[in-house]
């Protein structure tokens, strides 16, 4: 997405069946309100029968970077790990501007081994498209230097890989088959550069969203914005929350919940997700929004969080095509 734009920005045209049975075409020139709604406004406007999507040429170089962090000595709070994660989060906008994107994960505590022999840790797979390994290493160097102060407290392991086309990269790094069937309650927040200026504010948010020491709580970094995503802000038929156009990444905070959990247990988890974890993310980045696909359906500010300034326009479109 950093190089080619978000999925919604790839749609050139759609054929849609409306609630009254009519089939219409929408694109940059006709039925533009419906086109805008389909490109970022969530579901529910009609049934998409077909769509025309942009195609992009193959690439001849992708450089991938893998990083693992884990406490050398496990403690109840694993504070050193969270300190390092906070430093890393502050540096991600610069790293993204230098061409990096990808996904990161961290756990304060995990019920199984996560990194090495540790049940607490951070791991990421980042990459640069169209950048040589030497160029990527140069861009990564400031981050590695910042993490070096944790070398006496954390296990730090990193590696690099290069690929000569997109599909070999995808099959090795991204097209993986993760196990399905787990359940989790999620909240998310788009993170812009302004929200990361103060280390203490970042660290306070990380402390809360990482969960208590006795909780199984996961956090995911989606370093998928910047680059073309920012450039596509000029597209006047985009329906995405405009916060995407100024946020370099998203943070997703998730609480695992058993399929057999009682209603009371689920209610407690929902409350914690919305009013503890979600509130901490909003406090960190009050001027952005959420990633709708992995957002909190109980968010009391869902209009602003999910849609931003486009809420009224999308509501008008919904009432027009599917009242």
Question: Where are the language model's segments positioned?
Answer:
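Soluble FAD-dependent oxygen oxidases
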Residues: 1-323
């Amino acid at each position: 997405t950093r190089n080619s734009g978000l999925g919604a920005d790839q749609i050139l045209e759609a054929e849609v069946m409306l609630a009254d049975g009519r089939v219409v075409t929408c694109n940059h020139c006709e039925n533009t309100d419906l086109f805008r709604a389909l490109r970022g406004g969530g579901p529910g406007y009609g049934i998409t029968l077909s769509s025309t999507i942009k195609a992009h040429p193959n690439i001849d170089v992708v450089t991938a970077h893998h990083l693992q962090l884990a406490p050398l000595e496990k403690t109840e709070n694993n504070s050193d790990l969270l300190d390092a994660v906070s430093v890393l989060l502050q540096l991600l906008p610069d790293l993204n501007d230098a061409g990096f994107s990808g996904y990161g994960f961290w756990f304060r505590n995990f019920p199984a081994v996560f990194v090495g022999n540790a049940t607490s840790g951070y791991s990421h797979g980042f990459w640069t498209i169209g950048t040589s390994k030497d160029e990527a290493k140069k861009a990564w160097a400031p981050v590695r230097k910042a993490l070096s102060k944790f070398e006496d407290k954390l296990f730090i392991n990193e590696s690099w890989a290069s690929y000569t086309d997109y599909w070999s990269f995808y099959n090795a790094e991204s097209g993986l088959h993760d196990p399905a069937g787990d359940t989790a309650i999620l909240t998310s927040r788009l993170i812009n550069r302004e929200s990361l200026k103060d280390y203490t504010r970042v660290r306070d948010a990380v402390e809360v969203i990482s969960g208590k020491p006795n909780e199984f709580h996961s956090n995911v970094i989606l370093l998928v914005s910047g680059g073309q995503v920012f450039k596509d802000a000029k597209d006047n038929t985009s329906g995405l929350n405009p916060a995407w156009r100024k946020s370099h990444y998203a943070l997703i905070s998730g609480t695992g919940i058993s399929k057999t959990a009682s209603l009371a247990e689920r209610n407690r988890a929902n409350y914690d997700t919305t009013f503890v974890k979600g509130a901490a993310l909003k406090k960190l980045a009050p001027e952005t929004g959420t990633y709708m696909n992995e957002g909190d359906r109980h968010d009391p500010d869902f209009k602003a969080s999910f849609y931003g300034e486009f809420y009224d326009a999308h509501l008008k479109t919904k009432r027009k095509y599917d009242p």
